[in-house]
Amino acid sequence: SVAWGDESAETLREQIVNSCILELPPRCKEILTMFYYQGMTLDEIIIARGEKNISKNGLKTGKYKCMESLKAKVRDTFSKYKLKY
């Protein structure tokens, strides 16, 4: 059993999350990457994606749904491998 303080456990956790991100639809992948990894604001994401017909609240809702989808994939993967998160 591996404790979560262990470096190998943290690496495994990161690999699982990254793998689950890759399984997301392209729009979700892009939005979550821009927001969480690149530190972009919602306004910056709207501009970068060239989305003229979406409001900040619309993007916020979309990001939330993408995040919920990612969380579900991560939970499923952890339970499939009998890991605790």
What are these regions (language model features)?
Residues V2-G5, I47, E51:
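Short amphipathic alpha-helical segments at helix-loop
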